[in-house]
């Protein structure tokens, strides 16, 4: 019976150690995902701004209908 208790105690210690490592890994992954979402949000805002600037530039640029052909 004492051998069984020792074996069970070792198994519990092993499981507690693995759980501690898993908790640390989960926290690290959570921090990484949070940082990535912040970066994705910043990039999304930047793309929206660039798209808006491009549309403004296209609106203000003279179109081909207003330009004379190169041979004139």
From Swiss-Prot:
Ranges in coiled-coil conformation: none
InterPro entries reported for this sequence: SlyX
Pfam family, one: SlyX
Sequence similarity: Belongs to the SlyX family.
Name listed for the protein in its UniProt record: Protein SlyX homolog
Species the sequence originates in: Bradyrhizobium diazoefficiens (strain JCM 10833 / BCRC 13528 / IAM 13628 / NBRC 14792 / USDA 110)
Taxon lineage: Bacteria, Pseudomonadati, Pseudomonadota, Alphaproteobacteria, Hyphomicrobiales
